[in-house]
């Protein structure tokens, strides 16, 4: 059966205006105002075509003591393979929560397969000084391997501490401490990535340090 569906980049045109196409690798959480359910409408209203790759379906985010967790790992490669066979291309990749180490491997494969011009990595692993229940030390080490592939990383301070082996500190962090944390992350990135920390700031305008 022959399809008349055209998957070329001209499908990203509407009335002559270019519509960027973003692949989003992230979970779907039913409760908690996070992940794909929040990101998709926000990015879509910015006139970007969002193409989700679900990593898991959760009853709620992992900050709660209980959670129904439906792992999608076994489907992800087949899902992505079809995109590749259709000849789809993407102007960017946004990666959020990854439920296990194998999903990190799949993200690496996605980057190698599609070569997105822009890769934003949100290394979702914890909050308020604690790793989420599903996050192991092996997971943290594997996440470090993704950092050099990303153009932008957006860890909160908890995740930055996990990635750099920095002890968690309760209370406010000084700009000097945060700058030091960003420099540690820049060393892990090994590229001209832009770093953004989003937790425990009085002045959010100071939360981005460009390491280029």
Each language-model region and where it sits:
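Conserved N-terminal subdomain of the carbohydrate kinase-like
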Residues: 2-133
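Conserved phosphate/ATP/ADP-binding segment of small-molecule kinases
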Residues: 134-212
